[in-house]
C-alpha cells in the first residue's frame, strides 16, 4: 500500500492488487469482503455502495478505457462528534476499480488513526494469495 497526494493536496492510500494475488475476482466480491469487515467492527456503520462507473456512463462523462468497473463503499467510523466541523470529513469511502488484470483500492486519509489503520488492514487483507 502506498501513500500519495492526489492533485497535490489530498492524502490518499492506494493498493494495486493483481487478480492473481486475491481470491476476490470481481468488484462485487471485494464489496462483499469490505461489507464483512465493516459489519465485523461495531464502531463502523455501513451506508451504501455508489456505482461510480454506472453514474459516469449514465451522464455520458469521460471514463478511462482501462477501467472496467468502479464503485465506492461508503461507511462511517464516527466515534465522536467533538464539533460540527468534523462532519466535513465524514463519512469515509473506499474506492474499488477493476482495471482488467488488477484492482486498484484507494481511500483518502482519515483524521483519525484507528480509521486509517482499519482501512489499510482491510485493503492489505485482499492479498490473500501469494
Describe the function of each predicted region:
Residues 3-8, 63-64, 93-97:
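Short, flexible, solvent-exposed loop/turn segments with mixed acidic/basic and small polar residues
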Residues 25, 81-85, 112-118:
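Short, surface-exposed beta-strand/loop "edge" segments at domain boundaries and coil↔beta transitions
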Residues 32-84:
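Ser/Thr-rich, low-complexity intrinsically disordered terminal regions
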Residues 110-130:
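C-terminal partner/receptor-binding element of secreted or periplasmic proteins
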Residues 88-92:
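Short, surface-exposed coil-to-beta transition loops
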Residues 93-109:
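Beta-strand/loop substructures that line and gate deep hydrophobic ligand-binding cavities in soluble
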Residues 1-42, 51:
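Terminal, regulation- and interaction-focused segments at domain boundaries
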Residues 15, 72-74, 105:
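Generic recognition of long tandem-repeat/solenoid scaffolds
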